[in-house]
Amino acid sequence: MEKKLMRIGVSLPGELLDKFDKTLMKRGYSSRSEGIRDAIRTYNQHYEWMQQIKGARAATISLVYDCSKKGITSTLAKIQHEYIDLITSSVHFHIEEDFCFETIILEGEGEKIVELAEKILSLKGVKHSRLTTMPEVKTE
């Protein structure tokens, strides 16, 4: 079966595109299109992995966000209060004048952890984010 390629248009900030192009060159990609296809495959694999997180888990959500963006700090606090039963701790510090780094430590049901992560990771103003999980360790 022949795979048909689709042409799409994407708008990106110039700085992000420049960094992407430099990364592609360093990694030896033959074209920007191949790099974008690889990035989309990785994104889709990560999403599929997140959908398989089930059962008791320990996890962290780490994020960098633009704290000067109107409403993001209060929105993050509101979301965290909605999931207070999962959150065991959080660490927050300022890495630049307008950017904060936060790590939220979680313990609970995998499906609820993913639900919380998706709410946070999709916020406008979140520049980098990562969900990391591991099976909950039980001592008997």
From Swiss-Prot:
InterPro entries named among the record's database cross-references: Acetolactate_synth/TF_NikR_C, ACT-like_dom_sf, Arc_rbn_hlx_hlx, CopG, CopG/NikR_regulator, Ni_resp_reg_NikR, Ribbon_hlx_hlx, TF_NikR_Ni-bd_C
Cofactor note: Binds 1 nickel ion per subunit.
Gene3D superfamilies: ACT-like. Chain A, domain 2 (3.30.70.1150), Met repressor-like (1.10.1220.10)
Keywords, ordered alphabetically: DNA-binding, Metal-binding, Nickel, Transcription, Transcription regulation
CDD domains the record matches: RHH_NikR_HicB-like
Protein family membership: Belongs to the transcriptional regulatory CopG/NikR family.
Role, per record: Transcriptional regulator.
PANTHER family given in the database record: NICKEL-RESPONSIVE REGULATOR
Protein's UniProt name: Putative nickel-responsive regulator 2
Lineage: Archaea, Methanobacteriati, Methanobacteriota, Stenosarchaea group, Methanomicrobia
